Structure formats: C-alpha cells, structure tokens
Amino acid sequence: MRTQVGIIGAGPAGLLLSHLLYLQGIESIIIENRTREEIEGTIRAGVLEQGTVDLMNQMGVGARMMKEGHFHEGFELRFNGRGHRINVHELTGGKYVTVYAQHEVIKDLVAARLQTGGQIHFNVGDVSLHDVDTSSPKIRFRPNKDGELQEIECDFIAGCDGFRGPSRPAIPQSVRKEYQKVYPFSWLGILVEAPPSAHELIYANHERGFALVSTRSPQIQRLYLQVDAQDHIDNWSDDRIWSELHARLETRDGFKLLEGPIFQKGIVSMRSFVCDPMQHGRLFLAGDAAHIVPPTGAKGLNLAAADVQVLARGLEAYYKAGKMEILNRCTEICLRRIWKAERFSWFMTTMLHRDQGHTPFERGIQLAELDYVTSSRAASTSLAENYIGLPMEF
C-alpha cells in the first residue's frame, strides 16, 4: 500500500487529522488495533473547549454535537461548604465549553471518514514503524491481528496511538526526553441512571477528598471521587460511593445530589507526561502519544485537536507549496501550548485534591488559593481563560 500520510491510531487525534487532510486533498490511511465497536463503545467523558467545537463545525462534523451537546457558560468551585460560580462566558467575552462525550466525537469522525471514502483498518496487530528518518517511512501491521504482514509506504507517519503505542518508542532514546509526574491519588468514576444534579460542572474540595459532578445526558449523570492510587474498585460498594459523594458535596444551602442505579464504575490513574521532541525525521506524534494530563483540567482531547491542527497545517504547506517550515517547528509550536495546559491541569489537580502528605500549612495554602481564584476577578479571568482553552499561536 502507498499513501501520503500513514496514521497510527483511530482515536480523536488520528481521526481529526485524517479528516483535516482529506479536506485539503491529502491522502491518508489509518490503522487501529481495536475494533470499530471497541473504540465507539468505550465510554469516556468529554469537555470540549470553544476551539475544539469551532474546529469540528468548520470540518463539517459538528451537527450532532451541536444538537446533543450540553453548553456550559460556567462551572462551580465548592469548598468549605459553599459553592462559588466561575462565569466563563462573561470572563472570556462570550465563550463556553461543551460537554459531549469523547466516544460520541469518535462516532461522528469515523462516520465522516467512511462516508468520504477514508481508509481505516480496524483490529490490526503487530504494528511497527520503519525508516522514519528517511523520505519513505513505512508502517507494518497484520490485518485482523494475525493475518499476513502488510506494509504501508508513506511520505509521513502520524503517531496518534496513545501513551502505550509503538510510535513514541520509534523516536530514539538518545533524542527523546520525557517529563513525568505521577499523582498519589486516582479518580473513581461512575455513570448513573439519574438526571443531572446540577446544570454545570461542580468541582468540590473537601477534607475527605475531591469530588466532581458532571453530566452525560438528560437521563445520565457522571460523578467522580478521589481515591487512593492503590485502591481497587472492589473496595467500593454502591452504598459506600453514595455515602462519600454526599459527604464531599454537602453545602450549607441544601444541595441535593440525585441518586440512581450505577451502571458503570472504574478507577482512573492520574499522571502528567510530556515527550520532547514530538517529531523525528518523518514521524510526528500527536495526542496521548506525546503528552498526558490529569483529567481535572479536561484538556486531553482538546490538546489532541490542537496538535493535529498544527500538523495538518504543516502538511498542507508541504504538499501545496513545498514548504517545511511549520513541519520543522511542530514540536516548538505544540509544546508551547502543551506546557501551559500541563501547568493548568497540574494547578487544578493540586488545588482541588487532598494529598495525605500535606501539612496543615499546605492545607491552609490550598484553601487560600481557592478563596483567591473565586474572589479576585483577575484570578477568575485567568482561570476561565485556561479552562476555555488558550489560543493557537504559530
């Protein structure tokens, strides 16, 4: 097989990139180690920045998102038994965030690629990258996990295959520098058959730990609890989960948490990670292959969307004008924004979670930070600007 851009991974990064390239007349082939049913059926939350929503609409894949998504003009920070609303819409000149699950984004993008003749090979195995530092890099894989080995010859490879995929290790260790922080806590997330308990997201800092109230649909709400990093889901009965949520979300004004049957629950680890550089030869990384953020800042999918916008623009300049300038600067352009998103995600995580190693002094600093960002317009504006998504800067 021969194509212009070989894309490894059919997550948000790979699918967005493929469709952006299609709109510019650039060919691509996507390979993915999971089945279509797996990637479309893995339920994951999604809080989309204004820029990501705008991108999907500009690409012509945003119709269902605009119909079914929940548009939030703010969010609440809750501590010391009181809620404090951050009016993002007002503080950012009319912008908002959209709650639309990641797997729904994937469904829309897969449908768009297939409807326009895009090639996606699902359920592949033994993926490997070759000759990435030449002008003709190659991807090898086995169809249906154990079929006969096939090869895609490309001009460029986009590694959109997540944190554990084969793309990042294809950058030599002598070239690659990795930055990482692993947090001493995790999130226990549940999906509940109950209407949302609030119209906007609630981020709660409590003596017992962090809690988050989110939404999935008018009939389903998503809730999270901070738990120990070594904890196991078997330790958490439904009754224990509800008891802890009620305790951490309690307010002096009688907030009511709506209960219902829990039909999904699991524990998600928390880490921050950055790979530098995000490119080597004709290989470019995007999304979780290049960086991970804790979910507190809701930046994962949005960073992937930003990465592929830069890469798509660089590839467009190469194929239409023979220019390599943007491609050569991809790492520089992307990492400038990524590090700011990493900072914001770390800031939100450390401000909202209880670390068992904290002294009373550090607890006092944490509460002072919360008080400051909710009482100072300047601090609230900074928070809102980061939450809504920083601009792309080339």
UniProtKB/Swiss-Prot annotation:
Q: Does the keyword Nuclease apply?
A: no
Cofactor comment text: Binds 1 FAD per subunit.
Task: Please name the InterPro entries in this protein's record.
Answer: FAD-bd (IPR002938), FAD/NAD-bd_sf (IPR036188), HB_mOase (IPR012733), RIFMO-like (IPR050641)
EC number(s) on file: 1.14.13.33
Q: Which residues bind FAD?
A: E32, T42, I43, R44, A45, G46, V47, Q102, D288, L301, N302
Task: Please state what class of enzyme this protein is.
Answer: oxidoreductase
- Binding of substrate, residues: Y203, S214, T215, R216, Y224, P295
Give a single Pfam family match: FAD_binding_3
Provide the GO biological process annotations.
Answer: benzoate catabolic process
**Keywords, alphabetical:** Aromatic hydrocarbons catabolism, FAD, Flavoprotein, Monooxygenase, NAD, NADP, Oxidoreductase
**What SUPFAM superfamilies does the annotation carry?**
FAD-linked reductases, C-terminal domain, FAD/NAD(P)-binding domain
Q: Per the record, where is site Important for catalytic activity?
A: Y203, Y387
GO molecular function per UniProt: 4-hydroxybenzoate 3-monooxygenase (NADH) activity; 4-hydroxybenzoate 3-monooxygenase (NADPH) activity; 4-hydroxybenzoate 3-monooxygenase [NAD(P)H] activity; 4-hydroxybenzoate 3-monooxygenase activity; FAD binding; flavin adenine dinucleotide binding
Q: What cofactor requirement does the entry state?
A: FAD
Q: Which reaction does it catalyse?
A: 4-hydroxybenzoate + NADH + O2 + H(+) = 3,4-dihydroxybenzoate + NAD(+) + H2O; 4-hydroxybenzoate + NADPH + O2 + H(+) = 3,4-dihydroxybenzoate + NADP(+) + H2O
Q: NCBIfam families given for it?
A: pbenz_hydroxyl, PRK08243.1
Family designation: Belongs to the aromatic-ring hydroxylase family.
Described function: Involved in the degradation of 4-hydroxybenzoate (4HB) via the protocatechuate (PCA) 2,3-cleavage pathway. Catalyzes the conversion of 4HB into 2-hydroxypenta-2,4-dienoate (HPD). It is highly specific for 4-hydroxybenzoate, and is able to utilize both NADH and NADPH as electron donors at approximately equal rates.
Q: What is this protein called?
A: 4-hydroxybenzoate 3-monooxygenase (NAD(P)H)
Q: Which organism is it from?
A: Paenibacillus sp
Lineage of source species? Bacteria, Bacillati, Bacillota, Bacilli, Bacillales
| Name of the gene this protein is made from | praI
